[in-house]
């Protein structure tokens, strides 16, 4: 069935209360978006990320009365809101739409990320199979692509790896398929840990070949290589822990970082890491280095 979208432009101060009002009025989901092509950087811990001009989009079932629902939103908010728009959102099988547009991605001369329902373009290459129903990282985002591209250029045979913030497990699985001796996945999201292990099995790996942990239970023993594709804020906060996980002479690859955030990352790591490479794609960067 189709859905109705209610779009309201608000200030950052109004956004939390308007979001609550929309949910109280029966919205099935509410999202906050930049309404001015303005990039958003990570807020301080405990803060809500908001732009100076924020669009709230609330999703309602199609059989509601738009006039009555809008009145409910305003009543819950407690005062009159600015101009709003209603839009009809045609129902689609969104996973099918995503599948239609997801194609194999080449991340190195002999390394591909392939949808699990398609035949690999190069059967003789290393082909990592992913399923969109479980994918927290698919290789399509610049940060994931740059990490994979870097990893494909490393000799990882017999190395021990940690994929910190593993998501779909794409980086750790790639390392294992390239010959790493072992990999460990770490993530704060239990669903990501499940996705990682199911994707490992999909690629012919036993679950025990890629054990996964919440951060507080993760092994602390240093390894040969740490891969962390998260965000700049957490990377800075986790710098002491991530540095401690790398053996002396081992390698670290960091991404999820905007070009404008390069200095903060380097400042947090340069006392212990000699950065040897910075990759750039769109507005994102990937930094790799060696532990001193």
Curated annotation (Swiss-Prot):
MF annotations from Gene Ontology: protein-lysine N-methyltransferase activity
Per the UniProt entry, what are the Gene Ontology biological process annotations, in alphabetical order?
Answer: methylation
Could you tell me the keywords of this UniProt record? Cytoplasm, Methyltransferase, S-adenosyl-L-methionine, Transferase
Q: Where does S-adenosyl-L-methionine bind?
A: 144, 165, 187, 229
Q: Where in the cell is it found?
A: Cytoplasm
Concerning InterPro entries, the annotation shows:
Ribosomal_L11_MeTrfase_PrmA, Ribosomal_PrmA_MeTrfase, SAM-dependent_MTases_sf
* Catalytic reaction list: L-lysyl-[protein] + 3 S-adenosyl-L-methionine = N(6),N(6),N(6)-trimethyl-L-lysyl-[protein] + 3 S-adenosyl-L-homocysteine + 3 H(+)
Q: What is its EC number?
A: 2.1.1.-
Task: Give me the Gene Ontology terms describing cellular component.
Answer: cytosol
Pfam family membership, one? PrmA
- Is S-adenosyl-L-methionine one of the keywords? yes
The record's similarity note reads:
Belongs to the methyltransferase superfamily. PrmA family.
UniProt-listed HAMAP family = Methyltr_PrmA
Q: Which NCBIfam families match?
A: prmA
This molecule's function is given as: Methylates ribosomal protein L11.
Record PANTHER family:
ELECTRON TRANSFER FLAVOPROTEIN BETA SUBUNIT LYSINE METHYLTRANSFERASE
Name recorded for this polypeptide: Ribosomal protein L11 methyltransferase
Q: Which gene encodes it?
A: prmA
